[in-house]
Amino acid sequence: MPNQTPPSRYSAVAQGFHWLIAALIVTQFALAWSADDLPLGARKLVLLARHKSFGMTILILAVLRLLWRLFNRPPELPQGMTGIEKMLAKATHVLFYVLLFVMPLTGWMMSSAKNYSVSWFDQFTWPNLISPSESAFNLLRTVHDTLSWLLFAVAILHILAALKHHFWNKDDVLKRMLPFTKSEKRS
């Protein structure tokens, strides 16, 4: 049963999930963009292997984060937000959760469709999710690539919204997700 009283700021665990996943997403984009520019060879394969490992790490963290979120209520949105702003904030968070699951899963399925292994930092290999299929690979690659741009856009929107709250609205939305800061409960 979730905690019924909303806190004034995010817990250290929620902050840890947020910032670790954010750092991994930035790393994922850097790895993917770097690998895209390379010809097929050892360097590209190493970058793609790391991309897959970090993707599976994001999937594991997303599961843990969702479980944490189900039992730990987040702070309420500021009272000064309009109905449309609250709806957009909630929709953005739901979309983030969906993408945190769908991006790694489509990447995993894409590798499975090519019968490429997905290992986790060379410690163990995940099983294939689907049978090899060139048409499935092409479809999953398109979906994965398209969703990566959606994730990029949503992340930029999320950052801009946090900065708007901090500098324009002058509320504590950003501070309550930052470690080592104090946020005031404002009415």
Annotate the PLM regions.
Residues 1-187:
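Membrane-embedded alpha-helical bundles that constitute the cytochrome b-like, heme-associated redox core
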